[in-house]
Design a protein with these regions (language model features):
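Beta-propeller-forming repeat regions
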Residues: 1-178
Length: 178
């Protein structure tokens, strides 16, 4: 197998990458962990077609996870900043439209760092992991993180995601694995 390295852009502190297929075309996503930072998608021949997924009104992106059964839709963590308290971290939904990308907030969850989407029995669920309940500063790990689960309804515009805590007491809960 041969890999070809391609320079697409200069993104300061690019922390998150992901991809999805829409109409059999691959879209690559790149987002920064910095505040007030854009997220871009790249597609087309040699990924030369660049689109703004969200503008500088967002940032702090930790993860972008596409839905398996909802073409052109994803969830992402926005506004995660370890040094900021209180935390403004939130989960957002992105959706490809004929005019570009539409991104809407779903819910705030302080110190939301990692999440995943599970598709079980024709329903989608989100599992969210926080690194802490609260922090007085970046090095404060005295209040543990939690894990939550909630159903993601097919009509997210008219249904809220209700989270249920399923684990607590997770100190320095930085990672996640399926």
């Amino acid at each position: 197998m041969k890999f070809l390295k391609t320079h697409l852009d200069d993104i300061v502190r690019c922390y998150c990458t992901s991809h999805m297929f829409i109409d059999e075309e691959c879209y690559a996503f790149f987002a920064s962990e910095n505040p007030n930072s854009e997220c871009y998608s790249y597609t087309g021949k040699e990924f030369k077609k660049k689109e703004v997924v969200w503008d500088k009104d967002r940032g702090g992106c930790m993860s972008i996870i596409p839905f398996k059964d909802r073409e052109g839709e994803f969830l992402a963590v926005n506004e995660f900043y370890l040094k900021v308290s209180p935390s403004a971290a939130k989960l957002v939904r992105g959706k490809k439209t004929k005019d570009g990308w539409e991104v809407k907030d779903l819910f705030n969850l302080p110190y939301l760092h990692r999440f995943d989407i599970y598709h079980i029995n024709d329903k989608d669920y989100v599992v969210c992991a926080t690194i802490a309940r609260d922090k007085s500063n970046k090095e404060d790990w005295s209040r543990p993180g939690q894990v939550y689960i909630g159903e993601i309804h097919s009509d997210l515009d008219n249904n809220n995601v209700v989270l249920t805590q399923i684990a607590d007491g997770l100190y320095k809960n930085h990672g996640y694995t399926r």
